Amino acid sequence: IYQFSDNFMTLFRTELENYLVEQGFSKDNITIVDGANDQATQTGQIDNFISEGVDVLIVNPVNSSSAATITDKVVAADIPLVYINREPDAEEEQRWEDNGWNVTYVGCDARQSGTFQGEMIVDLGLDTVDLNGDGKIQYVMVEGDPENVDAQYRTEYSVKALTDAGLEVECLSDQVGNWQQDQAQQIVANALGQYGDKVEVVFCNNDAMALGALQAIQSAGRTVGTD
């Protein structure tokens, strides 16, 4: 797991372990380690697992861009590899298919997630969202991690849903919150302090950052969906 302190991944690893036990795996044969949000640490952990001769590796990469390096190590050891939650890029996935490797990715479609975010704004209608009446939707974007493919897709497709619907948009601020609630809270608080009532929409790449944004909005005396 890329980082144990991530609330979502805490739930994920708990459910994953429970499911494996339900399927008949011995808990003693399941080892889950904390990558501590450091790719070098995680790569070392993977090297250790390979040396120990594990039967399968499930990897939630710290950096999706490191997938090729991880894949090469694991494939060379002839160990099945499953990536979860953080999707490697399309070129890397195509490499698995071209070579017939026992490697796959399991996770949600981040393009769809981003589109759903944007469509929620579209469904509200311009009259509701365009609080300052200038005919544009001004937004603040809080990204999880610019190197993470899921973050890239959610960022791109949330805004694309607005422009595809014919809405004019203006990005007031695009900052990295590293998936963390406290960082997102500070980013949104700063944006509200700088842009005030001009901020009409806040997009966040995950739930934790959305909660941080909510706290900042409430602290600024504004109400989500109203002002």
Predicted regions and their residues:
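A residue-level marker of the well-folded mature domains of exported/periplasmic proteins
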Residues: I1-D227
